[in-house]
Amino acid sequence: MNREAMLETVRVALGRKPAQAIESPPAPYLPVVTSSVEQRIALFTAALEELAGRVIRCSSRETACETVRSLLDSKRAIASCASYLKECRITDLENVDSEFPDAAAYRQACSEANFGITSADYALADTGTLVMISGAEESRLVSLLPPAHIAVVPVSRLLEDLDELMLRIPTPSDRTSSMVLITGPSRTADIEQILVRGVHGPGEITVILVDD
């Protein structure tokens, strides 16, 4: 006798009605917490600085370009093909490379650069996270291989948290092969819990938030 037959026998003996299927209640919808732009900037800054990252706010694209120039201090940098970097004229800086004849030259430049410069598709305020969607404009190598990473991001791309990101990108697979979330500099620890930065990626990260 299977389980349902046994239970039916018990119900009949007790004079009870047949069991009715009970539908599961719908999952509760938790709305995204909304805060002001200034609150998001403050939250993002605090979260990233807690992870040894750095946040610089710029009032214009021109100021952002000059800030990048100052951070580079004549050292070599490689920039992604993000259209926002071009709009900020960062790819026009004399010590920033952004165009290469082939993939081999591109990889070599990434390995030799002191800085990798990207934008970001989004930034998450509550964790100080950059969201990088791989594609024609953004390459993972620029944000991964150089020892220092500079991300230039317009404030309008600053979201509250991961929940809001999922609402913006409900099906990431439709757009790209990967989506990378970068939270602070690369860090790792051995069995003795000795923390080391920069082993598996950039040991320094600076995010320049630009007012739209």
Label each region the model flagged:
Residues 1-212:
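The feature marks the mature, well-folded catalytic cores of soluble enzymes
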